[in-house]
């Protein structure tokens, strides 16, 4: 998958290459990240997600996060290169703060938070009858996979990331699957990602073990597009972005040759619209007074389906789950969409961490969520 960045980006990179791979974002330097995360559409091909009349998010009582070590919010945001945070409780904005030169109109990339978007569109496609059942074989919708390791994998197992197909998600290895999945020779009429995934070997029986695989969410996105006959951007606009009332157009990155959108990443939206997506989920998936998702979808998608080997945590249908009932979409470089039904709470963070992920950054982000919870709980 080849994309053509601006000359300014090439200048920032200090390189002479005439184009960049989409996964080059994993290896950008800090100035590149902070410049490009707010303008991915300037560097890569994308589809527009049209918005409707904005769903109001009125101001609520101001909230000051209470960090256990006394850290201030400004210090936290500066130290971790945070572009924006928003806290919405009971449908009201209790905290909204920006950094890195971002503002209310800034569209910031979400990376793997987009996985939760794609999962939600599966719920819509089930309600519409475009997807018959989660127990359908993936090959019903993507027959090009029939000769490989995905031939016996179900839609549900893709959503759970329990296909058993071998995968390497190492963000610092330029030869890992996540770095190479948009590379290789194209076959006429076949998305490049499908060609790559069709050649992967099996490691475990389907359904036996969870392994995080961005490429599989890309397959889910292709499956939704095949089932509905619509691009992910168009379907998201039709089912959620317009009827629920997002405040601005969003963007979904795509392959500039075959037009395939990346279901596992690539959504860019404003801070407030990420919060609105969380509120849509809290509201039970209702838009314009009508249910958008299959009955019971939200409860099923946001409960633990897979053991990920972390106490108190699990994985649902492209949502990370917690034993307290909260769940979240997480993206590399610091992105977060946290939903807490018990507290009627949505927390969003957009950032440009200096690394894709590491324990120290992840712990700091988790402490930010706890700091918000302390303030909400009055403790």
Task: Annotate each PLM feature.
Residues 15-103, 128-131, 160, 195-198, ...:
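N-terminal leader/targeting segments and the immediately adjacent pre-domain N-terminus
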Residues 104-105, 170-172, 178-258, 265:
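Catalytic-site signature segments of enzymes, centered on catalytic residues
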Residues 1-13:
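Sec-dependent bacterial lipoprotein signal peptides
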Residues 91, 108-134, 158, 220-224, ...:
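Active-site SXXK
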Residues 247-251, 298-347:
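Active-site Gly/Thr loop motif
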């Amino acid at each position: 998958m080849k994309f053509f960045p601006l000359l300014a980006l090439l200048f920032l990179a200090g390189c002479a290459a005439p184009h960049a791979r989409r996964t080059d974002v994993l290896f950008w330097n800090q100035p590149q990240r902070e410049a490009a995360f707010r303008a991915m559409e300037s560097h890569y091909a994308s589809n527009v997600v049209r918005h409707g009349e904005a769903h109001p998010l009125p101001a609520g009582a101001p909230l000051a996060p209470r960090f256990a070590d006394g850290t201030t919010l400004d210090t936290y945001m500066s130290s971790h290169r945070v572009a924006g945070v928003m806290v919405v409780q009971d449908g009201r904005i209790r905290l909204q703060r920006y950094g890195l030169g971002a503002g209310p109109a800034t569209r910031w990339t979400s990376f793997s938070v987009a996985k939760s978007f794609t999962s939600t569109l599966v719920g819509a496609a089930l309600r519409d009858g475009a997807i018959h059942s989660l127990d359908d074989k993936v090959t019903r919708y993507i027959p090009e996979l029939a000769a490989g390791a995905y031939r016996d994998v179900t839609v549900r197992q893709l959503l759970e990331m329990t296909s058993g197909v071998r995968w390497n998600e190492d963000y610092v290895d330029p030869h890992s699957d996540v770095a190479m999945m948009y590379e290789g020779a194209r076959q006429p009429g076949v998305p490049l990602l499908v060609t790559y995934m069709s050649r992967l070997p099996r490691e475990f029986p389907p359904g036996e073990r969870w392994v995080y695989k961005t490429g599989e969410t890309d397959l889910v996105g292709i499956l939704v597009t095949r089932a509905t006959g619509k691009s992910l951007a168009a379907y998201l606009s039709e089912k959620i972005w317009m009827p629920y009332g997002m405040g601005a157009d969003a963007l979904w990155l795509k392959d500039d040759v075959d037009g395939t959108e990346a279901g596992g990443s690539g959504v860019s939206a404003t801070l407030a619209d990420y919060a609105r997506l969380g509120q849509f989920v809290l509201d039970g998936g209702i838009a314009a007074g009508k249910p958008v998702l299959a009955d019971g979808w939200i409860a099923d998608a946001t409960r633990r389906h897979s053991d990920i080997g972390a106490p108190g945590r699990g994985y649902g249908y492209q949502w990370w789950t917690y034993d307290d009932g909260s769940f979240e979409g997480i993206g590399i470089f610091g992105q977060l969409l946290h939903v807490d039904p018990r507290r009627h709470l949505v927390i969003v963070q957009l950032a440009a961490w200096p690394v894709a992920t590491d324990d120290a950054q992840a712990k700091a982000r988790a402490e930010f969520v706890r700091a918000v919870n302390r303030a909400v709980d009055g403790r």
